[in-house]
Amino acid sequence: MKKTFTTLLLALTAMMTWAQTSALELLKADPKRSFGTDYPYHFTDAKLTASPAGYEPFYIAHYSRHGSRYFWSDFLYKGLDSLMTKAHERHQLTAEGEAFYNKFTAAKQELFTGWSELTQLGWEQHQGIARTMYNNFPEVFSKGGNVLAVSSLVGRCVISMSAFCQELAQCNPMIEIRENSSRFTLHAVVPDDRQNPLRRKYPRSKPRFEQNRAQFKQENPLPQTVVARVFTNTDSLPEASRIYYLLSNLYTSLPNIGHEGMMGNILTDEEIASQWEASNLGTYAWVFGPRYETIPILEDILEKADAVVKGESDHIADLRFGHDSYLGPLTVLMGINGADRDPEDPYEVKNCYQNWETCMASNIQLVFYRSQENSDILVKCLLNGEEATLPVPTVMAPYYKWSDFRDFYTARCQSVQPLNP
């Protein structure tokens, strides 16, 4: 028994070491991953595991965040405009700061107009994801069929849905797609939206690492360094207490709006990456707390998939387009790649969740397989186009029996009762 326990412990330690190395190596290979939820979608060339013998895909359940956009609120652009204009007028800018001020001013009208809107890159991301889905699973789409697509009421989600569906229809005009952005379907994409007539409130909780956050030590001289690159001094400037917040948030948003280079050498990708682990802790706390709010999304996935499996629905795909504030918590609720592990050690959080997985246009695809010779329906999960693990018991990962998948997640949904049933 002792030998078995030791072997298991060694195996778990090896897995944790691999996960840590994997996350940090990915960050080193592409420092922009440290932009987290601002990271533009990255198309992968990862090879998918072949279908089990005799099995073919026949249905896909999907949830996606909208694509790349301008910053979600105009306060960033207005705050920077006020800050930089005053500093310019008072001769408090360095040469680097003046260069940035001029570039920002030239783009100001675009930024003031575009805040929160989908960008061209965001449109192209969903086109690419749709075509990749079609090419990866031609058996699902080759004969055409009915697809239901629903989105939140926010414009960038509606346009993301349109980009995806147009591309899918171009792949095969026999695919019939019904697009819907309506209060009738909010429970499937943004269930706690105030306009959702089925809105339910769920309990929230903090991740366990919060009790030990003080153990996390990471010096951050970057704010002072960045401020000194832009300003000779910050006396009497508006937004002075939030200068680094404004500058760093603009910097990480620039790849999404086609303005990389606007800030010159004020910040670098590597400098943002040096603070990633602390940023990742904040994001994990943000997506962990409201995980139960996404129970209606998971219930909708289970219900629609079960209807297809039973022959009560003729859908070949159900598509959902929402926001990072739902996809991230849904990732935790489902425990995708261990996101539900909830470690006590803050240094372990990076091994179960990386905030770049909740990037622009991030998406979950659940692909269903069936066989003429075997009655078991199988499910595979893709996170951003790559095969992912689930906490559902299986002996054939990355494939899971639908019956096990359904029972596991039904129990998980039912284990938490809404505060206002």
Question: Where in the sequence are the language-model features?
Answer:
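Bacterial Sec-dependent N-terminal signal peptides
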Residues: 1-23
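Signature for phosphate-centric chemistry
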Residues: 20-146, 152-318, 322-421
